[in-house]
């Protein structure tokens, strides 16, 4: 079953390649959506994919896909009305 979530990721997640390594993980797993830096120093991810694959992706995000980053907290919000994406993009 397809699922969509918003992940708000807090910690050392800007200026360490977090968005680009998140994209690599998403591309490898076939997850679509976006990742962007936020003014408060966090990163926002909108991710869509099959339930089991999305859980793998969320686990990789929580573990920090970049060795120079650090994830302190992830706030996960289920999304209902999301436009379908055909790829995973780094924005902002």
UniProtKB/Swiss-Prot annotation:
Which family is this sequence assigned to?
A: Belongs to the acylphosphatase family.
Q: This chain belongs to which protein, by name?
A: Acylphosphatase
Residue ranges of coiled coil: none
Q: Does the keyword Chloroplast apply?
A: no
Q: EC? A: 3.6.1.7
* PANTHER family associated with the record: ACYLPHOSPHATASE
Active-site residues? 19, 37
**Ranges where the Acylphosphatase-like domain occurs:** 4-92
Catalytic activity, reaction form: an acyl phosphate + H2O = a carboxylate + phosphate + H(+)
